[in-house]
Amino acid sequence: MFNVTKKSIEWGGETLTLETGKVARQADGSVIATLGETSVMANVTFAKAAKPGQDFFPLTVHYQERYYAAGKVPGGFFKREARPSEKETLTSRLIDRPIRPLFVDGFKNEVLLIVTVLSHDLVNEPDIVAMIAASAALTISGVPFMGPIGAARVGFAGGEYVLNPDVDDMQKLRENPEQRLDLVIAGTKDAVMMVESEAYELSEAEMLGAVKFGHEAMQPVIDMIIDFAEEAAHEPFDFSPPDYAALYAKVKSLGETQMRAAFAIREKQDRVNAIDAARAAIKAQLSEAELADENLGTAFKKLESSILRGDIINGGARIDGRDTKTVRPIISETSVLPRTHGSALFTRGETQALVVTTLGTGEDEQIIDALHGNSRSNFLLHYNFPPYSVGEVGRFGPPGRREIGHGKLAWRALQAVLPAATDFPYTIRVVSEITESNGSSSMASVCGGSLSMMDAGVPLKAPVAGVAMGLILEDDGKWAVLTDILGDEDHLGDMDFKVAGTENGITSLQMDIKVAGITPEIMEQALAQAKDGRMHILGEMSKALSSANSFSAYAPKIETLTIPTDKIREVIGSGGKVIREIVETSGAKVDINDDGVIKIASNDQAAIKKAYDMIWSIVAEPEEGQIYTGKVVKLVDFGAFVNFFGKRDGLVHVSQIANKRLTHPNEVLKEGQEVKVKLLGFDERGKVRLGMKMVDQETGQEIQPEKKEKEEAGEA
């Protein structure tokens, strides 16, 4: 009944297995990949014909994590998986980016790739396994896919590269100074296709070394998929790339001159309008059959690409007049919004980001529910890209995959320089509103985010800047690396290479490559140019702000104290009674962690002090010999019970009340009276012994021996 194909190798200290032929047999390609005890299933289906008139490649990738994979039940009212989490969205993009360029040019049939996590051992991250499963499923499906690809995760600990560090290592990346890198790489046997990384100020050489290490480490996986496909692959889909040479030749002859003139215009919107006019002029001269040709859009793109790329490769200027290494003009401003905690407006050429920072308390932290368990994040970065930023009318609504991905890239770039939570106990939310875009808006978010946080008073370890690099690589081997690319250079170029970091090193690197043939020499040149660009941008940013400002008057103030964990119950009280009383009485917010760290927040410093004192009176131990203010709560024949130091009671013996003989305490005291008492010690049962006669009841100071003797003599 089943025709099972199964292959296994030892890889990175674990067994990697690929299996097909038993599950999801009606899919065009189905593979279950297992690393350790983490199993991921990838299923590929594709349409056998393109939709009429379709001029793009409709590839859809869905990565989904099932809670049962880790033995968990989903939260929420319905107790089932719902909309994709941020992790699922980011992993979908991680799979999509390296495979999309490897489909044969001209293939426009719809392709659907669904990747599902079936089992998670809480050791091996499922994203790498998912990419391997997806690659294998595509390779055996028969779809015109020029893979396979491999994938690997690279860490950097103790000066050594580490293959596929486990979940715990990556979760503790920020707290562990030895573990300084989380890099995911995907590529074919001969070329790197995609890099995504989070780093802690690594040098360009260290980052390049990590890419080389990862590409070499994935080779056994690629060889395994090839061997696997030789036994399990379906018949290749009969597809021949469309021949549109005649159509392209006609488009070029009709409109190359006008199109070149359009690309010579330096302002983006004027250039876009001129390009649209050139296209319209060409279309006006084409026949109905040529206008209906689904390859017309491809012919236009080829013409535009040849103009932009040819001018750069042949030593001419870029479309905005710059050479290959120049960064566009930069203007940085801070404190642009009066009531926010921190704000910055970062403008680089025709790309602009308005970035706002808000400081919150512990209750504002984001709770992340993942397969490996719940966690909390005190740093949030949200990126918004409205249609008006590119002068268009378009969809407006919740953030899409692109916005989530760009926001996470900026998050990775900035989180490496955040102060430790123990030093800066705030939740930080950064929002980047892209108000203009002509390339590299995510890197503008990094620059604006750094300035905005410093404007809010966040003591960053160092300012961070980012720059997007591009590449033009021709078939004859000529190439050019471009600094600070425009939108058209990204669209028509061969590489999008984003690098962010401080003066000391790289904090984030993202690379997407559309062609094979990217050599280590090209990558080294791109990193060197990116460093020069980053240093220039940091210099321009420092003109606006070079270090953290003082706190905004509108930001909450936070103080922390640490109490013994066995005292947490006393501070909370039965059913939360005590903590509610503290909050209501003081007016401050109080957040208690399981480790005994308490954060007290308010805009009013007096409220913070009130809450602090109330908590301290509960958890602190009274010290022998110290003087405290108390209240008489009960009088008995042998003395007075006094409540002091919060909820504590002690006995003042009748002989310790006054410097004279008393027959009953009510001769000098009454219930409810405020008194000053000295803690004399503890009896054999641990009961508190207090004294009054050695304390001046007016000043609260201890009576000196000579004064005491005079008082006793006077009484005699």
Curated annotation (Swiss-Prot):
The protein's Enzyme Commission number: 2.7.7.8
> Which InterPro entries did the record assign?
ExoRNase_PH_dom1, ExoRNase_PH_dom2, ExoRNase_PH_dom2_sf, KH_dom, KH_dom_type_1, KH_dom_type_1_sf, NA-bd_OB-fold, PNPase
Molecular function (Gene Ontology), one example: RNA binding
Where in this chain does the record put each S1 motif domain? 625-693
Any GO BP annotation = mRNA catabolic process
The record lists the catalysed reaction(s) as:
RNA(n+1) + phosphate = RNA(n) + a ribonucleoside 5'-diphosphate
One Gene Ontology cellular component annotation held by this UniProt entry: cytosol
Q: What region holds the KH domain?
A: 556-615
Q: What CDD domains does the database record attribute to this sequence?
A: KH-I_PNPase, RNase_PH_PNPase_1, RNase_PH_PNPase_2, S1_PNPase
Question: Which coenzymes or cofactors are required?
Answer: Mg(2+)
Which amino acid positions bind Mg(2+), per UniProt? D490, D496
Any one Pfam family here would be S1
Annotated stretches, region: Disordered: 695-716
From which residue to which does the signal peptide run?
Answer: none
Report the superkingdom from the record. Bacteria
Q: Which SUPFAM superfamilies match?
A: Eukaryotic type KH-domain (KH-domain type I) (SSF54791), Nucleic acid-binding proteins (SSF50249), Polynucleotide phosphorylase/guanosine pentaphosphate synthase (PNPase/GPSI), domain 3 (SSF46915), Ribonuclease PH domain 2-like (SSF55666), Ribosomal protein S5 domain 2-like (SSF54211)
Biased-composition ranges, Basic and acidic residues, are: 704-716
**HAMAP family, from UniProt?**
PNPase
State the protein's purpose. Answer: Involved in mRNA degradation. Catalyzes the phosphorolysis of single-stranded polyribonucleotides processively in the 3'- to 5'-direction.
In the record, the note on similarity to other proteins reads:
Belongs to the polyribonucleotide nucleotidyltransferase family.
Q: Output this protein's name.
A: Polyribonucleotide nucleotidyltransferase
* Species whose genome carries this gene: Cereibacter sphaeroides (strain ATCC 17023 / DSM 158 / JCM 6121 / CCUG 31486 / LMG 2827 / NBRC 12203 / NCIMB 8253 / ATH 2.4.1.) (Rhodobacter sphaeroides)
Give me the gene this protein comes from.
Answer: pnp
